[in-house]
Amino acid sequence: MSLSNWPLKKENSEAYNIKNSKQITIPDGLWIKCFDCGLLMYSKVLKRNLKVCPQCSYHFQASSNERIDQLIDQGSWQPMDVHLISTDPLGFKDQKLYSQRLKDTAFKTGLQDAVQTGTGTMQGKKVCLGIMDFRFMGGSMGSVVGEKLTRLLEKATQEKLPAIILCASGGARMQEGMLSLMQMAKISSALEMHKKENLLYISVLTSPTTGGVTASFAMLGDLIIAEPKALIAFAGRRVIEQTIKEDLPDNFQSSEYLFEHGFLDLIVSRTQLRSKLIQILSLHNHSK
């Protein structure tokens, strides 16, 4: 007798019927796949490792809130200028009104703009800290970002505190035109006043750090630190290749390439960043 004619009990046939089997629903975000090595891991494992792949050390993007938790002593964070909100001086519109885009992004991220600033302690040492957030319009630098960072640096100068800025940005915000470009000079001027008081400024470059941010305060640190394999650039790779009519190296605009050519002082993994910053702050205080 052929298998097709083999008698099956009704209850057995129903037990092996896929349609009748109980389906298991897996919650969204439970698993995360590494973009670099392809490792599939629990999201909790990635979070516990500060969003660094435990297999290949690929650095996932981290939010400004996550950065604060990773770097600052618990309970010591004092935010600054949380009330500042961008306006729409040009009445700019692309696919939607800039004013509406600001509202939508604020609702989605819970942020007022692309940077959080404030003071806190790192192993008891008080610092002024600015953390850019790429989730808010690509971390673009508009008038509010520039004003908040300038006020942060002025406070650091007034209170004789070291300043640390973590950069993550696509550059100047085109929706604000010249108002965004002038922030480059404004922040740089505040840094010069901070420097004249012989105070420490540490710039930490994360992926990506590009455009007007790279062309100003990101590269003005007394110490310039970058995360591994971070994209750090001014113009885009294709723009440069089309301009100079040459092919660029594969690792061009990576933190490793910049370190090799003397643009960076250190490349530090996110898992070691807090301890390295504390070490630098201790050495700076000891040298006074």
From Swiss-Prot:
Q: Where in the cell is it found?
A: Plastid, Chloroplast stroma
Q: In which pathway does it act?
A: Lipid metabolism; malonyl-CoA biosynthesis; malonyl-CoA from acetyl-CoA: step 1/1
Instruction: State if Amino-acid biosynthesis is listed as a keyword.
Output: no
Q: Which UniProt keywords apply?
A: ATP-binding, Chloroplast, Fatty acid biosynthesis, Fatty acid metabolism, Lipid biosynthesis, Lipid metabolism, Metal-binding, Nucleotide-binding, Plastid, Transferase, Zinc, Zinc-finger
For this chain's record, the cofactor binding note is: Binds 1 zinc ion per subunit.
Question: What GO cellular component is one of the record's annotations?
Answer: chloroplast stroma
List the Gene Ontology MF annotations in alphabetical order. Answer: acetyl-CoA carboxylase activity; ATP binding; carboxyl- or carbamoyltransferase activity; zinc ion binding
Enzyme class per UniProt: transferase
Q: Which residues bind Zn(2+)?
A: 34, 37, 53, 56
Known function: Component of the acetyl coenzyme A carboxylase (ACC) complex. Biotin carboxylase (BC) catalyzes the carboxylation of biotin on its carrier protein (BCCP) and then the CO(2) group is transferred by the transcarboxylase to acetyl-CoA to form malonyl-CoA.
Name of the protein in its database record:
Acetyl-coenzyme A carboxylase carboxyl transferase subunit beta, chloroplastic
Species of origin reads Pyropia yezoensis
The major lineage groups are: Eukaryota, Rhodophyta, Bangiophyceae, Bangiales, Bangiaceae
